[in-house]
């Protein structure tokens, strides 16, 4: 598996960056997709990029606690201003993909494995 920065993945996929440009140089070591917060808590690994449709404050808290590289929100979902402010404070880049989770995960997988 190749390692890319969050910025490189965002550029290759045309993702919108909503916040935390300072975190865009983090290395992405893999990916994790889930909308169940307890699943992410138990199974996501440091340095992974988290793909989800959840856009509330707890997503940022878990991403920070698990030391994830970034959060990618699917289906063009945009979180509220308070979530963006918390992500900025925690140094967690929040990106937005227009497509559904299945398509987004497939593209990230292809980038990391080809």
Q: Which role fits each region the language model picked out?
A:
Residues 1-21:
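N-terminal, charge-rich interaction modules
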Residues 25-26, 34-49, 53-114:
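Feature captures the catalytic cores and cofactor-binding loops of soluble hydro-lyases/lyases
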Residues 31:
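The Walker A/P-loop phosphate-binding site
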């Amino acid at each position: 598996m190749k390692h890319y920065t969050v910025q490189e993945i965002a550029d290759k996929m045309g993702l919108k960056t909503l916040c935390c440009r300072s975190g865009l140089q983090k290395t992405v070591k893999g990916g994790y997709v889930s909308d169940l917060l307890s699943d992410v808590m138990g199974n996501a690994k440091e340095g992974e990029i988290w793909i989800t449709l959840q856009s509330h404050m707890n997503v940022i808290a878990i991403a920070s606690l698990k030391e994830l590289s970034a959060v990618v929100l699917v289906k063009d979902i945009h979180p509220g201003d308070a979530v963006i402010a918390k992500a900025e404070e925690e140094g967690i880049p929040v990106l937005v993909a227009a497509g559904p989770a299945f398509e987004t995960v497939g593209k990230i997988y292809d980038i990391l494995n080809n």
